[in-house]
Amino acid sequence: MEQNVFFLPHEGLKLAELAEFLGAELANSDHSDVIVRSVAPISRARAGDVCYILSRRNREEFATCEASAVICDKALADVVPPHLPVILSSNPHAAFAMAGGLFYPAALRPVAISGESEIAPSAVIDPSAKLEKGVIVEPLAVIGPHAEIGEGTRIGANSVIGPDVKIGRDCSIAAGASILCALIGNGVVIHNGVRIGQDGFGYAPGPRGMIKIVQIGRVIIQDNVEIGANTTIDRGAMDDTVIGEGTKIDNQVQIGHNVQIGRHCAIVSQVGIAGSTKIGNGVQIGGQVGIKGHVTIGDGVQIAAKSGIMTDLAAGGQYGGIPARPLKDYLREAAQQVSKSKLRGRNPGGKQND
């Protein structure tokens, strides 16, 4: 790949320094002084790059690999060609992610639109708002009355922070986001176009049509949450909408009013979560999953992409399909359908015996 002007390579680290940072082990101390500057996939890694492997199936990709180091666990070390330095880690994927963050710290947060180091002249900040030391406000951002923003937080261009909103320290609010009726913890990352705290979808059928139900709750976002671009999180109706500590939400996810999401969950793009759903800790939800309102999903649940959740899901299970059922049942049914389809294809128009 040609030089990437958006993310420039690191000035360089010795492999011994990188291994120490990762809490890993350099397989051969003779390689301690090898310099690395970047991360890359194994198939196109070049001198100065670090890559990683998770399977023996990666063996063939070493044919085009010119990396300066490979991260893997001890069981796969024999797959790596002998001339390549090896960093041994019990969790190569996590170690590779840590290396990427070390080489490219700026890529861990939304890209700044301007070079502002303080408050842009065109930003609109209500006199009653409280900004701690080191807050950066980019051009045309608006911060409402009595809002509070913690030290080291960056407010992106054209973003809107509503009245009385509280944002913690070391947060990144990207360009074009809007935040209303919300309390946000420390270290939170909110990407471009996110909408937080708008009306939930609440109506009561009446004799002359729909009657709006007031939405008077809040959104609570705990520490170290990351929210992807154009995701929408409605404020609670009478209770709060809560996103638990460390949870990561992809782009274009809709979270309805009163939803409670636990800690360290992962929610992939285009998921829709209807109101008052409760999701436990460590839950993983695949893309385009639809979740009915007022259901409870237990801790550690994994949900396959495109599933429809209509009932409560027990903790620790894997589920898939519409309506969702245990994943092994769903996969068995899918295999049976494929088998039946192939049989019909071999005997078009044929009669079936009763």
Swiss-Prot record:
GO biological process: lipid A biosynthetic process
CDD domains assigned to the protein according to its UniProt record, in alphabetical order: LbH_LpxD
Active site, UniProt feature: H257 (proton acceptor)
PROSITE patterns from the UniProt entry: HEXAPEP_TRANSFERASES (PS00101)
EC number per UniProt: 2.3.1.191
Gene3D superfamilies per the UniProt record, alphabetical: Hexapeptide repeat proteins, MurE/MurF, N-terminal domain
Source superkingdom: Bacteria
Record's subunit section: Homotrimer.
Name the record gives this protein: UDP-3-O-acylglucosamine N-acyltransferase
Source species of the chain: Rhizobium etli (strain ATCC 51251 / DSM 11541 / JCM 21823 / NBRC 15573 / CFN 42)
Gene that produces this protein: lpxD
